[in-house]
Amino acid sequence: MSSTKNLSRREFIGVSSMAGIGLALSGTPLLAQSSVVQTGALATSKKFKMGIIGCGNRSRSIIGALNSVPEIEMTAFCDLVPNKAQARAAECIKNGAKPRFFTDMNEMLKMSELDCVAVITPSDTHKDIVIAALNADKHVFCEKPMALTVADCNEMIGVNLRSGKALQFGTQRRHSPEYKAFIEALHTRPVGKILQSSLFDFRGDWRVPAPDEFPAGTPYWRLDQKRSGGVVFEMGAHIIDVNNWVFDSEPISVCSLQGVNNFTLRKRDSSDHAGVVVEYANGAMMNYGGNVYNYGSQALDTFFGTNATLQMGGGKLSIKYGFPPGFPKPKDLPQAEVISLTGNNREGDGVVEELHYFAQVMDGKQKAYPDGYIARQSVQIMEGANRSAQERRVIDVKELG
């Protein structure tokens, strides 16, 4: 673990290359975290056999997307609950795939014909399943968050580097046409340096699972802080990753207040609301807020630059330019603009694109993106936020390992 916890991103990519993961460093889009990856740039004619581990609600999205990814064949489904995998396959498979079914992950991993697995299980299980799959010589696509602690992330990165297999994480906004258009606008408009962000995830409470959805006697994991990480992990994983993408800098300190305060919801010890402030090495600051009792509309994500304010939401990006009072108005001050970010992507959120890209990674034509380093950055913030709330102090990210 100690050999991986302090790897810089450039070092991580270099070691990954030596381990046989993807292309050499030169010319890859990952040298700058803020780059926009072109998902369809290098098509593959190969077909990779995938096993699905975890057939819960999130698997609907992944399986549905795989119907549109001919490079990946759904070969095996695994879930602890008997017949749950069969039911999910019958519901979601539309491309004629006929997978085998398992209740024991280790038995599925023995399939020699299996090239890769998708890990779509509760957050606290990711580390052990990912490591088992890598040790079984499988490429791994793992849903977010990477894990619940930085220590677990470091262990996963170490096994990944030794395995020589690909490990990619499912923060799909990095592959979403909408978010890539946002990043492209950020780079091509004269907005200046991004100094601060104000981001929110306000939503309703989690759905009520069916009585037979989990093994008998197993409580709903999303209501358990130790298993889910609470509202910051459950909802922050997406937008915090986007913020890291925009800031293109390392988080260095985290402060948070959070807890359970809406007792009209189901009984839980997982936080139902949170406020988080993060300082980055480049001086930028993120403000994040989330809750699971919103019955109104979502707030806009706002980024404040030295020359402009950007607000994103509802498929649109608005940019308003300005200058400080007391200074002459710049002659070339651009007009405010509203940019449509909604393209013709029928899935909408980047899931199909990230799976196409994962096939290219397995074919050696791309590097995993997001990789373990990128995914770990979000965990640094989220674990730091939870510890800050528990210990009532600012957390230095270096404390987390």
Regions found by a protein language model. Give the residues of each.
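A structured beta-alpha segment of the ubiquitous adenosine-cofactor-binding alpha/beta core
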Residues: R100-L114
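Beta-strand-loop-alpha-helix segment that lines the small-molecule cofactor/substrate pocket
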Residues: C116, P122-S123, K127-H175
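Glycine-rich phosphate/pyrophosphate-binding beta-alpha loops
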Residues: A237, F263, G289-S297
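N-terminal secretory signal peptides and thylakoid transit peptides that target proteins
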Residues: S2-G20
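C-terminal glycine/acidic-rich active-site capping loop/insertion
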Residues: P211-A216, V242-W245, S253, R266-S271, ...
